[in-house]
Swiss-Prot record:
Keywords: Chloroplast, Membrane, Photosynthesis, Photosystem II, Plastid, Thylakoid, Transmembrane, Transmembrane helix. This is Photosystem II reaction center protein Psb30. NCBIfam families: PRK13686.1. It is found in: Plastid, Chloroplast thylakoid membrane. The gene is psb30. Belongs to the Psb30/Ycf12 family. A core subunit of photosystem II (PSII), probably helps stabilize the reaction center. It is a single-pass membrane protein. The chain crosses the membrane at residues 9-29. It comes from Phaeodactylum tricornutum (strain CCAP 1055/1). PSII is composed of 1 copy each of membrane proteins PsbA, PsbB, PsbC, PsbD, PsbE, PsbF, PsbH, PsbI, PsbJ, PsbK, PsbL, PsbM, PsbT, PsbX, PsbY, PsbZ, Psb30/Ycf12, peripheral proteins of the oxygen-evolving complex and a large number of cofactors. It forms dimeric complexes. It comes from the Eukaryota. InterPro entries: PSII_Ycf12_core-subunit. GO terms for cellular component: chloroplast thylakoid membrane; photosystem II.
Amino acid sequence: MINWQVLGQLIATGTIMLAGPAVIVLLALKKGNL
C-alpha cells in the first residue's frame, strides 16, 4: 500500500523548497525590470 499522507508531505515539502527560490527570483526580476 502507498502511504498517501507521507507521500503528500514529501510532495508539499518539495514544492515549497522549489517554489521558494522561484518566487524570490521572479520578484527580483520584476523589481529589476522596473
